[in-house]
Amino acid sequence: MSVQGIEGVLQQLQVTALQASGSAKTLPAEAGFASELKAAIGKISENQQTARTLAQNFELGVPGVGINDVMVNMQKSSVSLQLGIQVRNKLVAAYQDVMNMGV
């Protein structure tokens, strides 16, 4: 028997043992497209809030906040927003394509 065959059998035995002991990982109920989309929108919002806060701190003259940090965070926020808009546009186009399909 080859090493790969033994490793495959060993892996199957480990999975079976985990399932039998009841400690097998279960997927969260909300694992899917909706949760990923929600997380991405949350990240976009977080990027915008961070950039806004950093810009305000720079305007107020808070020590340790440089113009380069502000500009990088503003660009990061802008790029993530543009990406979100493009994803939304693709989703709308895909939805319209599905709705225009004949049955």
Swiss-Prot record:
Q: Which GO terms describe its biological process?
A: bacterial-type flagellum-dependent cell motility
Q: Where are the transmembrane segments?
A: none
Cellular component, GO, one term: bacterial-type flagellum basal body
Mind telling me which InterPro entries this protein's record contains?
FliE (IPR001624)
Q: Name one GO molecular function term.
A: cytoskeletal motor activity
User: What does the UniProt entry say about where the protein is found?
Assistant: Bacterial flagellum basal body
Keyword annotations for this protein, in alphabetical order, are:
Bacterial flagellum
The residues the entry assigns to the signal sequence are: none
Q: Taking the first listed entry, what is the main subcellular location of this protein, grouped into a coarse class?
A: other
HAMAP family per the record? FliE
Report the sequence similarity comment from the record.
Belongs to the FliE family.
User: Under what name is this protein listed?
Assistant: Flagellar hook-basal body complex protein FliE
Which species?
Yersinia enterocolitica serotype O:8 / biotype 1B (strain NCTC 13174 / 8081)
